[in-house]
Amino acid sequence: MEFSVKNGSVEKQRTACLVVGVYEPRRLSAAAEQLDKLSEGYISTLLRRGDLEGKAGQTLLLHNVPNVPADRVLLVGCGKERELTERQYKQIIQKMVQAVSETGSMEVVCFLTELHVKGRTSYWNVRFAIEAIQESLYSYNDFKSIKPEVRREFRRVIFNVANRKDLADAERALEQGKAISTGVAFAKNVANCPPNVCNPAYLAELAKGLAAEYDNIRTTVIDEAEMAALGMNAYLAVSRGSQNPAYLSVIEYKNHPNPDAKPIVLVGKGLTFDSGGISIKPSDSMDEMKYDMGGAASVYGTMKALAEMKLPLNVIGVLAGCENMPDGNAYRPGDILTTMNGLTVEVLNTDAEGRLVLCDTLTYVERFEPELVIDMATLTGACMIALGAHNSGLMSTSNVLANDLLNAAEQADDKAWRLPLGEEYQEQLKSNFADLANIGGRLGGAITAGQLLSNFTKKYVWAHLDIAGTAWKSGVAKGATGRPVSLLSQFLINKANNQ
């Protein structure tokens, strides 16, 4: 898909399809008013007849509009004027995509980016439009022998901005929106890939692929022998039941003006399949446990977006690849594991494995002397119960970092909600036989999981994103979401802008 921006008048658009908005009740947007004057009241006459009310998401396709050089005019309902939210805006963009896809149009000139969206600028209108279009057009059919038949997709979208002074911001939105959308799609592709293909070795190859594609990326892959030498016993215990060995992939992106600047480290839990191990999961929906590597997928997608945006930062992405399977050699409830930093953990449930992989990985990244560390993990069902599928759960030992992430989440419309940490939750992790237990009981399960991780982050500023409820969708719309690539990308954009 080709995207571009311009500042032009609606009456001069010679294109396959011209898209303008109509507010509720039957109120023309500025661009639609210009078209109405040009067509001598043709559009307002149709509205008076009741052909379109203007409710958000309604569409009306017109052909041969008098005096209008465009082949088609698509009217899109935008709801009540001045009340358009980010969510509604993305929905009307997606309705535009659906309507245009059913025509033979190869090009679209879109004036919806001129609409007033609450609290947003032209930059955000253009960027959100690109992200919404790419979301609408995404499909994952790699393993279908007969590909679904689709109409020929339009190839080019031109976004109009009302003020010439906003063109520079719109161009920036164009480049960043394309990069972030690419990163989201990469994350989705990896997460949607079946676990008989996407195993820890596959994740490692993807990480190497980024290094082959970008000159300022270097990838190092650590195998189980190296992990054993480092004392990553908790990580390795989780992997013991699988015939697919674990791999820790370290993707180093260096583009800071000061090559010695401390890096931002992104850690992704990469359980390419989680059966639960000896504490085996119910069979219902176990297939969705291929998505237990959503954290690693989001780190991979973010590193892709980062490289495309060429942000002047030093960033390290870590993919903690592993499988959790039942086997005669699998770790057991009751085992006590000595972690890389020396703390011992009693295993009370082998299905609480992600935190064991992460605790050693979080210790490993100390060697980079990071500015900060953020880990992403589909960690707990408890977070899904608490926050549903809309907000990722955020925990942090730093108010500054937590606020920066929440700000980025709001900006990118990739929402997160902060949950507490504290010594009262640490009490729930007490064990009679080890320094820590790997679970803290039924109450506050998302928080006690984050609290456990905090024991391994004492040497740097740290935040944890529990994306168990946001990394994928179930049911008819089943598939990976690519979250929180947008949040992380915005966080990095903000870091680059403020240094």
From Swiss-Prot:
SUPFAM superfamilies given in the database record: Macro domain-like (SSF52949), Zn-dependent exopeptidases (SSF53187)
GO biological process entries: proteolysis
Subcellular location field: Cytoplasm
Cofactor(s) needed by this chain: Mn(2+)
EC category name: hydrolase
GO MF terms held by the record: manganese ion binding; metalloaminopeptidase activity
Binding site for Mn(2+) 2: K269, D274, D292, E353
EC number annotated for this UniProt entry: 3.4.11.1, 3.4.11.10
GO (cellular component) term, any one: cytoplasm
Keywords assigned: Aminopeptidase, Cytoplasm, Hydrolase, Manganese, Metal-binding, Protease
Residues annotated as binding Mn(2+) 1: D274, D351, E353
Function: Presumably involved in the processing and regular turnover of intracellular proteins. Catalyzes the removal of unsubstituted N-terminal amino acids from various peptides.
HAMAP family (UniProt xref): Cytosol_peptidase_M17
Protein's name according to its UniProt entry: Probable cytosol aminopeptidase
